[in-house]
Amino acid sequence: MLLGASALAMGTPVRAQSAANPQVRVEKNLEARMRDGVVLRADVYHPATPQRMPALLQRTPYSKNPQDANSLYHRLASAGFVVVVQDTRGRYMSDGVAVPHDEAADGYDTVEWVAALPFVDGRVGMFGGSYSATTQLLAASERPPHLVALFPSASYASRYDMVFQGGAFYLADGLGWNLGQAVDARRRALEPRADRDAAIGLSPDERRQLQTTWMWALPLDAVTALDLRRYAPGYFDMLAHPSFDPFWERFDVAARHGRFEVPAYHLTGWYDALLNGTLRNFAGMRAHAATDRARRNQRLIVGPWTHARPTSNTRRIGDVDYGEEAGFDSEALMVSWFRHWLGGAAAAGDYPSPPVRLFVMGENRWRDEQEWPLARARSTTLHLASDGSANTAAGNGRLAWHLAAGAPTDTFTYDPHTPVPTGTAGAYSRAPTDQRDLERRGDVLVYSSAPLDAPLEVIGPVTLVLWASSSARDTDFTARLVDVAPDGAARALTDGILRARYRGGRTSPELLRPGVPTEFTIDVGATANVFLAGHRVRLEVSSSNFPRFDRNPNTGAPFATDSAVVTARQTVWHSVAHPSRLVLPVVPR
């Protein structure tokens, strides 16, 4: 429903029946005044009851105005909750200036404002994914008295690690997200009488330019598209802090795990790029939350999903069908969770489910577990080996259960002008793409095991210990774990990247000595997959994953300042002296 300009200017609450659900009444643009006087606006979905009810709050920078009239908000309201959806500071209908992820104080103030609304019974839960997961966690870390429970989907534990993975910049999201925010900021500045409640994003032409021009532009800190420096200065703030420092500390959720006092249900997918953050938040809060009840009532579910909220019809990613069991009604789980904590059942005790539920790919079935990572998983090593030419899947790269004889090195050339493509369009979604086209590239080293005699169950974080040298003073190394079927189909499972200068940690960059073999420990991410009998375990090694990550220009210059790039000659070592190895968390069967 669109509001007239006068209603927008005055912030007048407007009431309407929901066309999608006549039992739900929608109240538009209720005003909440923050501690500094800035007014934020929210829409409220009222259930069909005159009674005071518990409330569920979502705070979003993407417009509180739903794109789908039959949205989650209506379902939650129909389940007996007052649903409050607020535009975050400086976005859409809310006043003020947006500072991305600076949501702790506003989150606290909004929770307490919601609890005091005359139609709310004083109990508040929070829900939402991605940025809206951040708004929950940062608010909860401030301990608002009336906050009872959380349902964060796809969350980060460290904003730095969300922006820089292994020191490499998440280019597709970092640039694409900020350009999307700039569109709203530009409209607010140039069209003050426009309908600010309507969601807005990049135009088709702007999306094309993002893919074909803007993400290729160098230097990174000279981007002028959409007057980005004026309308989304946060992009340049990120570029100015390529190492973890006090700028990032104020957004660090992991450092606040000991402050959490409420139960939380953490949801993510094996192909969500925020998977690692969600796993870390679950484990950290379960171990360190401030109360015993909060520690006991952290829950985790991980399915064969991407960055989007799963539904009962979510069973495919691309060409891979995970079967009927993969479909999952996350909204029903959310209703169950909040009914327990906000509907009176909490008095009966803890939430009645195992702490962890995982979808195990390969066998495509759900499994309940007691912890993450799994205590019974055993670190198992596969050694890299070759006869000196592991380039492409047709090469002679091998993964061996024991240190194997053979040539001590493989080499490839990394040219930033022709990077290895990410292969998927989503900035924060990966996919089980068939890798065979990429494995034909000479700049991709491919190491494969022999066909397995029995199933191999891998559940947990995967690590590559890589001995490598480079002709450059700084470069990147990438790793990807792949499940290869007997017919040759090569399904990507998880991947990682490390910028060489950050091999010693995210606070201490150190350039390479060209040509000197150096040990790199690459976090390849987590997975849950059974490699079936007859399948092969495969590892791909290269130096780029573009445009998900920026291209390392190989110069060793300060980050984001290079206007030109150089080619690097890369050498991967595998010998007794330099034992490159893939470390898998294998679960005994």
Model-derived features with residue positions:
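Cap/lid segment of the alpha/beta-hydrolase catalytic domain
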Residues: P47-A115, S158, M162-F164, F169-L171, ...
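Short beta-strand/loop motif that positions the catalytic acidic residue
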Residues: F260, H266-T268
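Alpha/beta-hydrolase fold nucleophile elbow
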Residues: P118-Y131
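C-terminal, loop-rich substrate-recognition/catalytic regions characterized by aromatic stacking residues
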Residues: D197-V223, P310, R315-R589
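Active-site-adjacent alpha-helix of alpha/beta-hydrolase-fold enzymes
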Residues: N276-Q298
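N-terminal export leaders
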Residues: M1-L2
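Accessory cap/linker subdomain of secreted extracellular hydrolases
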Residues: S78, S141-R259
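N-terminal cap/lid segment of alpha/beta-hydrolase-fold proteins
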Residues: S18-Q51, S448-A454
